[in-house]
C-alpha cells in the first residue's frame, strides 16, 4: 500500500473517530458491521477500507448485496462478482433479491423503487442482529446531493446533505471523493464493475455528475470537497437550530396559564401539544420556523411513506 493510500485510509479513520461511526452497540459488545456492496468502485473501496480498519476498531464485518432484478444478465454478473470477491477476501456475504423481502418488481421500476428495496433489505438485516449498515456514499455523492436539492428547492436541513450517521447506518467514506475511492481500489489491486445506468443522462443525478460537477471542477479542482464541507457546516447549523427550537417549545409548554381554555384543556387531555403564545411570539423567526417545522415533521414523514 503506497503512502497516498495510507493517507486516505487514515483520513477515513479520523472521520470515523470524529463521528463515532463504529462506537460499540452496547457496553462490552463490539458493533456488528455490514458493508453494503454493489460491486462498484465506491463499495469495493468501502470493503477494502473496512477490512483495513477492522482490527483497529474491533468490529465483526460482513457484507450484503442487493440484486434488484432490473438489469437482467448485468445484474447477475454484478452479483457473481461480489460473491467471488467476498469469498476471496473472506467476508461473509448475504445476497438479497426482491422476493427475499416479499416484493415484486413493478413494470416501470426505477431508482426510487430500487432504493426502497435496498432499505427494506437493510431493515431485515438490522432486525436479524446486524447493528449498523455501512454504505459507500462519498464526498462526490454529497456534492451531487447538495446540488440536486438546491435545484429542487431545500432549506437548511436539506442543505446538510447526507449525514455521516443515523440509527442503523453509517457512511465512512463521506470524506473521500469518487476519484479517491478508485485510487484505493487500484492501490489494493481491487477490481470493480461499472453500472451502465450511471453512464447515461437519463437520471437528473447523472446529468449533475457529468455536467455540473466537471464545470465546477474547472473553476476550482477542490469543488467537490468544498461542497461537501458546506454540507457539514449546514448540518451543524441545522442541529443548533433544532436544539434551540426544542428549548423554545419546552419553555412555551411550561408557561401555560393555570386555567386553560376548554379547547386547549381537551387537547392536552387527548395527548396533543399545547403551548403558551407569548414565548413563541418573542422567539427569533428562524427558531420559530424550525420549531413549527418540527411539529409538522411526523405528518410529512407519514405522507412520504
Segments (PLM) and residue ranges:
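Core alpha/beta nucleotide-donor-binding catalytic domains of modification enzymes
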Residues: 1-214
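Contiguous mid-protein beta-loop-alpha structural module that forms a pocket-lining wall or clamp
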Residues: 170-258, 275, 279
Amino acid at each position: 500500500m503506497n503512502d497516498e493510500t495510507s493517507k486516505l485510509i487514515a483520513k477515513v479513520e479520523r472521520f470515523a473517530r470524529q463521528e463515532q461511526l463504529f462506537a460499540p452497540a452496547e457496553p462490552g459488545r463490539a458493533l456488528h458491521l455490514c458493508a453494503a456492496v454493489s460491486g462498484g468502485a465506491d463499495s469495493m473501496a468501502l470493503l477494502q477500507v473496512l477490512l483495513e480498519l477492522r482490527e483497529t476498531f474491533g468490529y465483526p464485518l460482513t457484507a450484503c448485496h442487493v440484486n434488484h432484478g432490473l438489469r437482467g444478465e448485468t445484474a447477475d454478473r454484478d452479483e457473481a462478482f461480489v460473491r467471488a470477491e467476498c469469498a476471496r477476501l473472506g467476508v461473509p456475504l448475504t445476497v438479497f433479491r426482491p422476493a427475499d423481502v416479499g416484493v415484486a418488481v413493478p413494470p416501470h421500476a426505477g431508482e426510487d423503487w430500487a432504493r426502497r428495496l435496498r432499505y427494506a433489505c437493510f431493515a431485515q438485516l438490522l432486525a436479524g442482529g446486524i447493528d449498523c449498515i455501512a454504505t459507500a456514499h462519498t464526498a462526490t455523492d454529497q456534492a451531487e446531493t447538495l446540488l440536486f436539492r438546491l435545484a429542487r428547492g431545500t432549506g437548511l436541513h436539506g442543505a446538510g446533505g447526507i449525514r455521516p450517521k443515523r440509527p442503523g447506518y453509517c457512511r465512512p467514506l463521506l470524506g473521500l471523493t469518487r476519484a479517491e475511492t478508485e485510487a484505493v481500489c487500484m492501490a489494493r489491486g481491487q477490481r470493480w464493475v461499472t453500472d451502465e445506468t450511471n453512464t447515461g443522462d437519463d437520471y437528473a443525478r447523472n446529468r449533475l455528475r457529468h455536467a455540473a460537477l466537471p464545470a465546477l471542477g474547472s473553476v476550482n479542482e477542490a469543488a467537490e470537497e468544498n461542497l461537501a464541507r458546506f454540507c457539514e457546516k449546514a448540518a451543524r447549523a441545522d442541529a443548533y437550530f433544532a436544539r434551540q427550537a426544542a428549548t423554545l417549545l419546552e419553555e412555551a409548554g411550561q408557561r401555560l396559564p393555570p386555567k386553560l381554555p376548554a379547547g386547549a384543556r381537551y387537547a392536552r387531555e387527548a395527548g396533543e401539544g399545547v403551548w403558551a403564545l407569548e414565548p413563541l411570539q418573542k422567539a427569533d423567526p428562524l427558531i420559530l420556523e424550525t420549531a413549527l417545522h418540527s411539529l409538522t415533521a411526523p405528518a410529512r414523514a407519514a405522507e412520504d411513506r
